[in-house]
Design a protein with these regions (language model features):
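Short, contiguous, pocket-lining structural segments
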Residues: 99-103, 127, 139-146
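Outer membrane beta-barrel
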Residues: 1-88, 92, 101-125, 152, ...
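Outer-membrane beta-barrel pore domains
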Residues: 15-18, 33, 118-119, 134-243
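A conserved mid-domain beta-alpha-beta active-site/ligand-binding segment of alpha/beta enzyme cores
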Residues: 124-128, 133-135
Length: 243
């Protein structure tokens, strides 16, 4: 069984920011050869973290772990207040313009092909459903179906180039579809910080488009939701497990 607790603290007053400790995730995991089974509230990370990097409640299954061809399947429930759209949903609830539930059914699969240490190919499919919220409040199709593909190439061990494109379906106007129903990511990086290796570091330059409905919970810190542009950054491991 694995778990993670999150808490906020104010170092100036040595007090918690909100007085609460939250259970971020807790799940049971079993590994049987190249098969991994997860049950509970567990993390999901799609290809390059563009579509989704977060926690969901349900079941997950990885087939072919650490092999050339692998697949990760997951199904369960996800609270959309934790998504990139969370602020808009919370504001609508507080204003009384939305009174329905915020939990969606979510199912997905990520297929991976790693023929060598230099090349990786990943394919995503994700289905998200909550009729009252998606259709009633956000005026998009229910369910939403996301699909996309990403690749990573390493010409040498310390340099990588990755890119990918993701899209969703909806019945919105052509103009809104054109501007908001897709996401893409292009990134060039050198090395990378290893949380178990103090002193390790990485730098990167990327051009990303995080479409308003083209992603659910993206992983990026610098690229904001519903924006397009350059991101330049890096990571450094100060101490073990401190990046």
């Amino acid at each position: 069984v694995k778990a993670r607790l999150d808490a906020k603290t104010n170092t100036k007053t040595d007090a918690g920011n909100d007085g609460n400790i939250k259970l971020k995730r807790a799940w049971a995991e079993g590994k049987y050869g190249a098969t991994v089974v997860r049950l509970g509230k567990f993390p999901v990370f799609t290809e390059q973290g563009v579509l989704f990097d977060g926690e969901m409640s349900g079941a997950g299954l990885t087939l072919g772990a650490d092999r050339t061809v692998s697949a990760t399947l997951y199904a369960g429930r996800y609270n959309l207040e934790d998504s990139a759209w969370g602020d808009e949903i919370t504001e609508a609830k507080e204003a009384g313009t939305y009174t329905g539930g915020t939990t969606a059914n979510m199912q997905g699969i990520t297929l991976n092909w790693d023929p060598s240490e230099r090349f990786h190919l990943g394919v995503d499919y994700l289905r998200l459903g909550n009729n009252k919220l998606l259709t009633g409040m956000m005026d998009v199709k229910d369910p939403l179906n996301y699909y996309g593909v990403g690749i990573t190439y390493r010409p040498v061990q310390t340099v990588y180039l990755s890119g990918g494109y993701w899209k969703t379906n909806s019945h919105e106007s052509a103009e809104i579809k054109k501007e908001h129903m897709k996401s893409y990511n292009i990134e060039l990086g050198y090395k990378g910080a290893d949380e178990s290796d103090p002193g390790s570091f990485g730098v990167y330059a990327a051009y990303r488009y995080i479409g308003g409905m083209g992603t659910i919970a993206p992983t990026f810190d610098g690229a904001m939701w519903n924006t397009k542009g350059w991101e330049i950054g890096g990571q450094y491991t100060v101490l073990k497990n401190v990046v």
